[in-house]
């Protein structure tokens, strides 16, 4: 039996599509259904390594929420911006240069059969498919070449939600305008509106939802409260909402324009005893305890950006003073003497010359995911010695030590040329180390003031990988214990309302085993460690979803 599909579209980027799709994926999974996420095309430099290559982080985490093994078919097209006008195209997990060079309108039609094929396969293999759109479905200049919004909803016969960020203002205009700019056949797929990030008295919304329904025929199914600390990785932008420097360990992450895999730094914002800023000016890193150079999708361009802003001198002063520094992937490459690119993969550049090694880009991209631990470390990083953590590599660069006297102080700390320590600088090709609770505790404890913070302080808000699974609904239910967030518990009952209103029809859902076969039958090595445990029992049996109402409202 073909899966029932639910699609989450938004009026804008950042409306809450990824968050709501994750919540729906978990809720359906808790009913014992076999669930998978899908997003036809994602534009993001945040990616995770899976079998077959890489996929967007948002769909990776949605797969974990659905308790299924992440699969490149869940995000068949990933566009990784390299400049203002060019993106690297990842198709089914692998880089495809010929597609990157293709004119985008022609590329869209060329790729639709792949998108449609992945969609049909996932619909055939699952009971429920949670589909996420991109940006807005009402971009009338893009509708003719749509790969990711209403064309997908139509192909999947998906009951579609439109979610809007009410905190930005103009929510009803956004929803009405989006609805009106859709074709009549696509309007018929819209089953409800969702107002997200609401603060204040819900009674103040009246009679807005009723008037909107009178204009469009579409009900507002839910009003979801503002909740910044949900712990799920952000897909777009930098975490500028993080706390200002206060007590505890101060951390600055360089926010260069082509930063990649920034979602791995979410724990720095969530961890008690740490204070985080995203550094774009030299003064931002002048007095920090720990400086982080993250990954980059365009190392040459981001090195030029550092020099233009005077940040190169600030980084050199920090590292030369032997203050703690963490460099990951592209950041590691920046600290060396040079980046060579004989085949024109990304671009050559002169490095900062702070560590005695150089990097050469290779034509083949390296993908690897596994369990790692670092060799004995010293100084600030000593507490990390021997701690096991899950990590992944996505890179073209190969880095080797140079025949220089200072290279004797460069110590390999990870296998296969994946990491080095040089004084107080730790340089790694391994993404994801900071997502380990044990690693974060070890880092936090390096500052005397941080030891005052209780292990349980703000523990509920820690990143979504912690606690064994991503369970948005359970998180929202637990939030009632936080007096500052008393409205959060609204989401669970309103989520149930959404779910029971979405899918019309007379036939019952096909119930899968409590352990969905996609996860259960996979080899343990293929699964992230968070999936190697039984899922929590659902709050109600699958049969409670046997019949849905035949009308939207």
For each feature predicted by the language model, list its residue ranges.
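Compositionally biased, intrinsically disordered low-complexity segments enriched in Pro/Arg/Gln/His
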Residues: 532-539
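Low-complexity, intrinsically disordered or signal/transmembrane-proximal segments
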Residues: 481, 487-490, 515, 540
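Short, intrinsically disordered C-terminal tails of secreted or membrane-associated proteins
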Residues: 545-552
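Short Gly/Ser/Thr- and charged-rich N-terminal loops/segments
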Residues: 477-480, 513, 535
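Flexible phosphate-sensing "switch/lid" loops adjacent to ATP/NTP-binding sites
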Residues: 1-317, 324, 363, 378-453, ...
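A conserved active-site-flanking secondary-structure segment within enzyme catalytic domains
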Residues: 336-391
């Amino acid at each position: 039996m073909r899966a029932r599909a639910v699609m989450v579209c938004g009026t804008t980027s950042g409306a809450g599509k990824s968050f709501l799709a994750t919540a729906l994926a978990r809720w359906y999974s808790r009913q014992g259904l076999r669930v998978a996420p899908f997003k036809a095309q994602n534009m993001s430099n945040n990616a995770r390594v899976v079998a077959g290559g890489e996929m967007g982080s948002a769909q990776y985490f949605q797969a974990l929420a659905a308790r299924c093994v992440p699969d490149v078919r869940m995000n068949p097209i990933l566009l990784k911006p390299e400049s203002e006008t060019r993106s690297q195209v990842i198709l089914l997990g692998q880089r495809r240069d010929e597609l990157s060079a293709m004119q985008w309108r022609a590329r869209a039609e060329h790729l639709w059969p792949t998108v449609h094929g992945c969609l049909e396969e996932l619909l055939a293999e699952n009971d429920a498919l949670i589909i996420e759109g991109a940006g807005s479905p009402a971009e009338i200049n893009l509708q003719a070449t749509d790969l990711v919004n209403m064309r997908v909803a139509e192909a999947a016969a998906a009951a579609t939600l439109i979610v809007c960020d009410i905190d930005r203002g103009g929510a009803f205009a956004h929803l009405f305008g989006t609805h009106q700019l859709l074709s009549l056949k696509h309007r018929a797929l819209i089953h409800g509106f969702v107002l997200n990030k609401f603060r204040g008295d819900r009674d103040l919304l009246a009679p807005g939802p009723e008037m909107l329904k009178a204009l469009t025929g579409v009900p507002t199914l839910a009003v979801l409260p503002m909740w910044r600390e949900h712990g799920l990785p952000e897909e777009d932008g930098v975490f500028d909402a993080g706390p200002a420097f206060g007590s505890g360990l101060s951390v600055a992450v360089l926010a260069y324009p082509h930063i990649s895999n920034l979602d791995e730094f979410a724990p720095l914002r969530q961890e008690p005893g740490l204070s985080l800023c995203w550094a774009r000016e030299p003064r931002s890193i002048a007095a920090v305890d720990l400086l982080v150079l993250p990954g980059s999708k365009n190392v040459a361009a981001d090195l030029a950006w550092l020099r233009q802003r005077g940040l190169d001198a600030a980084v050199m002063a920090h590292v030369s003073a032997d203050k703690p520094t963490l460099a990951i992937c592209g950041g590691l490459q920046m600290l060396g003497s040079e980046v060579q690119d004989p085949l024109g993969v990304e671009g050559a550049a002169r490095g900062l010359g702070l560590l005695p090694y150089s990097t050469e880009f290779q034509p083949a991209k390296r993908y690897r995911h596994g369990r790692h631990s670092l060799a004995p470390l010293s100084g600030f990083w000593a507490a990390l010695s021997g701690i096991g953590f899950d990590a992944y590599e996505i890179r073209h660069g190969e880095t080797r030590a140079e025949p220089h006297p200072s290279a004797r102080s460069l110590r390999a700390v990870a296998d296969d040329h994946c990491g080095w320590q040089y004084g107080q600088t730790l340089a790694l090709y391994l993404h994801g180390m900071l997502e380990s609770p044990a690693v974060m505790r070890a880092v936090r404890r390096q500052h005397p003031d941080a030891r005052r913070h209780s292990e349980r302080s703000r523990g509920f808000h820690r990143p979504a990988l912690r606690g064994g699974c991503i369970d948005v609904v359970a998180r929202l239910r637990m939030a009632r214990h936080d007096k500052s967030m008393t409205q959060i518990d609204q989401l669970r009952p309103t989520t149930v309302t959404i779910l029971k209103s979405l899918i019309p029809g007379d036939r019952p859902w096909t119930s899968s085993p409590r352990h969905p076969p996609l996860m259960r039958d996979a080899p343990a090595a293929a699964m992230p460690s968070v999936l190697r445990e039984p899922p929590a029992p659902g709050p109600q049996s699958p049969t409670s979803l046997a019949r849905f109402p035949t009308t939207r409202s």
